Amino acid sequence: MGAASGRRSPPLLLPLLLLLLPPPPVILELDPALQPGNFPADEAGAQIFAASFNSSAEQVLFQSTAASWAHDTNITEENARLQEEAALLSQEFSEAWGQKAKDLFDPVWQNFTDPTLLRIIGAVRTLGPANLDLEKRQKYNSLLSNMSRIYSTAKVCFPNKTAPCWSLDPELTNILASSRSYTLLLYAWEGWHNAAGIPLKPLYQDFTALSNEAYKQDGFSDTGAYWRSWYDSPTFTEDLERLYQQLEPLYLNLHAYVRRALHRRYGDRYINLRGPIPAHLLGNMWAQSWENIYDTVVPFPDKPNLDVTDVMVQKGWNATHMFRVAEEFFTSLGLLPMPPEFWAESMLEKPSDGREVVCHASAWDFYNRKDFRIKQCTRVTMDQLSTVHHEMGHVQYYLQYKGQHVSLRRGANPGFHEAIGDVLALSVSTPAHLHKIGLLDQVTNDTESDINYLLKMALEKIAFLPFGYLVDQWRWGVFSGRTPPSRYNYDWWYLRTKYQGICPPVVRNETHFDAGAKFHVPNVTPYIRYFVSFVLQFQFHEALCKEAGHQGPLHQCDIYQSTQAGAKLRALLQAGSSRPWQEVLKDMVGSDNLDARPLLSYFQPVTQWLEEQNQQNGEVLGWPEYQWRPPMPDNYPEGIDLVSDEDEARKFVEEYDRRSQVVWNEYAEANWNYSTDISTDNSKLLMEKNLQMANHTVKYGTWARKFDVTNFQNATMKRMIKKIQDLERAALPTKELEEYNQILLDMETVYSVASVCHENGTCLRLEPDLTNLMATSRNYQDLAWAWKSWRDKVGRSILPYFPKYVELTNKAARLNGYQDGGDSWRSMYEMPFLEEELEQLFQELQPLYLNLHAYVRRALHRHYGPDVINLEGPIPAHLLGNMWAQSWSNIYDLVAPFPSAPKMDATEAMIKQGWTPLRMFKEADNFFTSLGLLPMPPEFWNKSMLEKPTDGREVVCHASAWDFFNGKDFRIKQCTSVNMEDLVVAHHEMGHIQYFMQYKDLPVTFREGANPGFHEAIGDVLALSVSTPTHLHKINLLSSGDGGYEEDINFLMKMALEKIAFIPFSFLVDQWRWRVFDGSVTRENYNQEWWSLRLKYQGVCPPLARSQDDFDPGAKFHIPASVPYVRYFVSFVIQFQFHQALCQAAGHQGPLHKCDIYQSKEAGKLLADAMKLGFSQPWPEAMRLITGQSNMSAAAMMTYFKPLLDWLVTENGRHGEKLGWPQYNWTPNSARLEGPFVGSGRVNFLGLNLEEQQARVGQWVLLFLGVALLVATLGLTQRLFSIRHHSLRRPHRGPQFGSEVELRHS
C-alpha cells in the first residue's frame, strides 16, 4: 500500500547499535521571516493568521519533504542527519505557529462561523511531536530515522554464506510471490521478521512513550485517539466493527477455499483443514494479499490466464511505460496529466548504482503546487501495474487540491486518499480493459471466466480486509497501554489468528517483534485508512460506473474514457479535507455512511460459488483448532535452496522424459550392436554412449536434486523425481566413471568370449558346448573337468577386476546417499525390512527344498556310488546338470520318480516336427495374444537375434530382452536351441517384452517392473501354463494332456528341479554380494565365503579343493555383469502367487499345477492392468491388482508343490533319509578325480595336468608329496566349509531393473 505525502518505505538489514549512530543533529533556528506575527484574537484575525501560515508552511514543508526524499532515495548517515535537522525545523515551525494559534484563538475558535477556517485552526493548533522539549524532540526524530533505516536496510542472508543477501524488494518479495517451496518460503519469512523486527522493538517502545506524551498535550488520550480523530466520528470504532462483521462471511468462505487448495499442495503435515493457515504460504510477506497464489487456487485453470504479467514482459513494457499507461487512464477521464517535475524527479525503478533506498511505493507532495513525485521500485508485473495506478491516484489527488490551504491538502479522510487509485485499478484489472490496452487477446464473458476473475480480485481485496482492520487494532492497544511491551508479539499474533485465521510458521516469542516487520509500523503510517479505503473504493466504483452509464454486473465495469465519471471524481478530489468527509461522500455516492453493500454486490457471484464449493467439500468455516501450529520441516534450513514448486517439477520431468528417450535409445542401440557383435569398434562406441548416458544422468539427476519433493501432493511426480535423483554410477567423477565402465566391459567381455581348451586344441564355449556337456554327461571326470576349467578360465580372470569394481560401486552408492552398493540395490524394493522378509520366505520354502535335496542326493548316490556321494553330506556341485547347480532339470532322467511313466519332455516332438527358434517365439507370441495381450510388433521380428549367429561373430549369448525406448522397438537376444527348456525361456523373455509394451506410454522413469522381481515373474507365469501337459497337448507337443498320479508326480518333480532347486541359489548370490559390498567379506575370503553360503543354503560343495586364488562367483554371468540377483528369488515366489490368482480369474478348477490360463481374457486383463503400472506405483499396488492382497507369500508355491512334497516326505521316510547335510565338511573322494580328461591324452594327478607316462613314474617318486598334498587339501577343505554367521544388515535403497534375465539351460 502506498503512503501519501512523503511517507517512508522498505528494504532490509540489522541496524547498527545506537551507540554507533551519529551524534544528535545540530540545533538550528527557524528563519525569523517564518515566525508568526501578531494577529487579532478574533475570526477576522484568524483568517489573516491562516493566510500567513499557508505561505510560510509551504516553504517549511518543501524543505522537510525534500530532505526526506533525499534520505529515502539514498540512505546515508549524512542524509539521515539532514533529514533530522529538517524535521527539527519543521517541528519548531509547528510549535511556533501552533502555540500562537492556541494563545490567540483557543478561547474563541470553536465559535467561528467559517467551517473551513475552523478546520484550518484545528489543524494548526495540533502540535504533536512539537509539544516535546528539544531533547525529546531530537530523540523522537532520531527514533523515526533509525526505525526507517533498520527496516529499509535489513537483509536476509543465505545460510552459512555472506552472499547473496536478499533485500525485501525485490528479492524477498519475489520469493514470497513465486516460490512454492515450503522451506524457502519459511526461511525468507523467518529471516525477514527476525532481521527487521527484532532490533526495532526497543526503539518502538521509546517511540510509543514519546508520541503519547506529545499528543496528550494536544488533548488526546494517546496517539491512537489522535489518529482516530481524523475520521470525525464518535462511533468510528463501532462502525468499523459493524463493517467487518458484514464482510467476515465472505472472508471465511475465501479462507476455507484457499486452505483446501493449499492442503492439496502441501498436505496434512503443513495444512490443518480446521486450523489457521501458516502465514508464509499466501504469496505475500504479511499474508495481506493472496493474488500471488492465484495459480494454486484458480477455479477453472483451462480458462484464459488473467495475470497478464507474461504478456507485459513479452511486449517489452518497462516501468516508465506502466506509469504512462496509468497517466493515460486519468487523462481519459478528463483529469490532469502528470506535470514535468513528476517525470523528471520521480524514482520509478530501484537504482542500479548501489544506493540503499526505501523501496516501499509512496507518493509525495512537495507543497509548492508543482512538484509531485512517486518513489517505487517498480517491477513489470500486473500486480505492480495496479500499484502504479494506486500511487498515481495519490498524485492526482495532490494535483486536484493543490489550491486548497496547506492544512486542507489531505484526503477527506485518510481512506479517501488510499481509495482513489484503487478505484481506477478496479477498471484497469477488468478483462475488457486489459483487452483495450493490448494485454489480453480476447474477452471471454462466461460464468467460469467471471468466477476466475472475481476470485483473483477477492485474493487481493477480500483477503486484505482482516489485515487492514487488525494492524491499527494492535497499535491502538499499544498506544493505550492495553498491550504492554511484554505482550507486543503475543497480542499481534492473537489478532492475526483471530481475524485472519493465520499462524506463525515457526515459534515466536517476546524476543520477536513481528509487527515491526511491516513497513507502516516502524514508519508510523496509520493503517486503518486501508480498511476504510477498501470499503470506500467500491462505493466510489459503483457511483462512477453509474455516471459512466455502465450496464451489467459491477465487476465488469470499466470507466475508462468516461469524462462524466471523471467530472464526478474531480469534484471529490478538489475538496481535499476542506469539508467533512461525510458530506463529500454524500455528494459522490448519495450516502454519508461507509457501506459494505457495493463491495458485497461486486463479489456476489464468487461469494455464491465459494459457498457452494465449501459445502460440497464439507469445509469448516473458520479455524476451531486455532492453537494448531505446523511442524518444522526436516533438516531446516539446509534445504531452503531446493525447489518445491510442482509446476516447475512437471516441466523438468517432461524435458527429462523427452531427452531420455533419445539418449537411452542411442545407448540401447550401441549396447545391442556390441552384444551381437563383440568387437573393438563396437566396444568403443558402447563406451561413448555409456559416457553420454552417464552425462545425461548426471545432468538431470543433479537438476532433480534441486527439488524438494517432501511435500509434493502429486505422488507420481514425487516418485519420478526421487528416482531421477539417484545418479547411480554416474555420480562418480568422470575419470572413475570411465574406469568403472571399462571394468564392467572388460569383465563381461572376459565372460562372453571365454572358451576352455583340451590339450589337443579342441576348445569349448559356454554356449552351447559346456552347457550341453554339463546337461547331458554323466561322466564324473568329464563334468569335473568342465566345471573346473570354466572357473579357472573365467573366475580367475575376473578376480583382478573385482575389488576395484566393488570399491567404485560402493563409492557411487554413497554419493547417492546409500550406505554401500548392496544398500543401493535393495532400495528398489521399497521395503525397510527386505532381508528379514526374504529370510522368512526362504524358511517357509526350506522344507520343500530339503526333501528335494535328500531325494536327489539318494538318486545320485545310486548312479555315482558312495565314493562321491555322501547321504549325509553336501552334493558335489558339478553333478546337478548345470554349471552352477542352480537348476537340476537336466538330471531328471536320473531322478524321475516313475521312469516308466510317459515322458513329458516335448523336446523330441519339437525336433520331429521341425520346430525352429522362430517357431518357438511365434508360439510364445500366440500364447500372449490368446490372453488379449499385445502381439509382438514388426520391429521385434525384424531385429531380434533369436539364434546364435553362424557368421563367426562373437556374441553375448545370455538371453535378454531389450527395450529401445521409442515405444515400438523391442527385441530379444537369445542363442536359442530347439528344446522344451528354451521354449520356456522364450516365454520368459517375451514376458519382458510384453511388460515393455504395456508400460511404453509411461514416462521413461517408470518403464520398468513394479520391482525387479516382477519383470522376471511375468514370463515365468505364462511358462507355468506352457509347461503343463494340458498345454503341450494343445500345441501338439504331447499326445495326451491328461495323466495319472505317476505322471503328475513326474511333472511336479521336473518343475521342482527347475523351481525349487533354484530357490537357495537365487537367495544366496546377493547374500554374498551384499556382504562383499558392506565389507564383511573381503578379497582375502571371497571364495571361502562364497562356498560357505552355497553349503549353508544349497547343500552343495566343490568337487575339487578351492583356494583364495580361485574366484568361483565370477564364473556366474551376473557377477561380472553386475546384475542384481535376488530379483530371481522374488520372482520365483511371486510367479506362483500370480499363477494362483490368474487361474482363479480363468475359472480353473482342480490342482494348481494343472492350470493352463491359455486363451483366458480375464486372466490377461489382470496381468495387463498390473503391467501398465510399470514402476509408477509401489509394487504392493501391482500385487494387489493381480492377487487382491499386497504381500509376498510362499503359500501359493507350497500349494502348487503340495502333492510332490507329500510324495517326497513319504519316499524319504521310506529310505530313512537325513534331511540336510549334517556331515557338512565332507568332500568327494579325490582318488576318483585321477584319470584321463576326455580327448586330451593327459591325466590329472593330484591336481597336476600330466602326460600318462609322467603320472606313472611320478606316482612312486611323489608318493610322499601326494600324501602330504592330500592332508593339506583336507585341511583347507575343513576351513573352506566352516559355516560363518553374519549379521543381517537392514535394507535401505537399491538399483533399477536391468534387462538381463536369468537363463536356465537344458
From Swiss-Prot:
Function statement: Dipeptidyl carboxypeptidase that removes dipeptides from the C-terminus of a variety of circulating hormones, such as angiotensin I, bradykinin or enkephalins, thereby playing a key role in the regulation of blood pressure, electrolyte homeostasis or synaptic plasticity. Composed of two similar catalytic domains, each possessing a functional active site, with different selectivity for substrates.
Name of the protein in question: Angiotensin-converting enzyme
Residue positions with a glycan: 54, 74, 111, 146, 160, 318, 445, 509, 523, 673, 695, 714, 760, 942, 1191, 1225
Membrane topology: Single-pass type I membrane protein
Cofactor(s) needed: Zn(2+); chloride
TM ranges: 1257-1277
Binding positions (Zn(2+) 1): H390, H394, E418
Ligase listed as a keyword: no
